[in-house]
Amino acid sequence: MITRYAAAANVAHIQASQLIRDAIADLDVRPVTSEDLRRGPILDNQSILTDAFAKVHATEARPIIFDGHCLVDVGEQPIEIPVDVIRQLQPSGVVLVHAPADEIVRRRKNDTSRERPVRTSDELATQQDRCIALCTDYAEKLGIRFGQVRAGDESGFAQSVSQFLGT
């Protein structure tokens, strides 16, 4: 959905996980996988992320859609991304793409390409609620807008992003 919007609207789609993987790979000789990132030091990776993003931001002429997570589910306790990390990204708005917990459970069950902690529908619903609270907090503390869009709602996503970009 985000990739399609970015291509149609001529905006850059920057994925947090890919930025971190590329930055770590530049420092290391071995390839970095999504699983390496999930199991690695999440908060340490945020410094790598913000440094890498600053380089992209300085050279990218198009508006940027930064595609990342506010909560990283790594095991016992999900890790929340601090507002200071979000502040360094200088967003003009935050759009939370969410889905019903039952749908997330189904998608995770069918996605054998990576390991994830096993979560019940109730646990995922709690995480989704926490994501809403985090994004609301980001918006309030940074003085930016916050919108929510259901996964797959391409027109809703386009409308939210267009408002933030002023297009």
Question: Can you describe what each PLM-predicted range is?
Answer:
Residues R62-P63, I132-T167:
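NTP-dependent small-molecule kinase module
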Residues V32-E35, R87-L134:
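A glycine- and Lys/Arg-enriched "phosphate-lid" helix/loop adjacent to the NTP-binding pocket
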Residues D26, E76-Q77, R106-R108, Q159:
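Short, well-ordered secondary-structure micro-motifs
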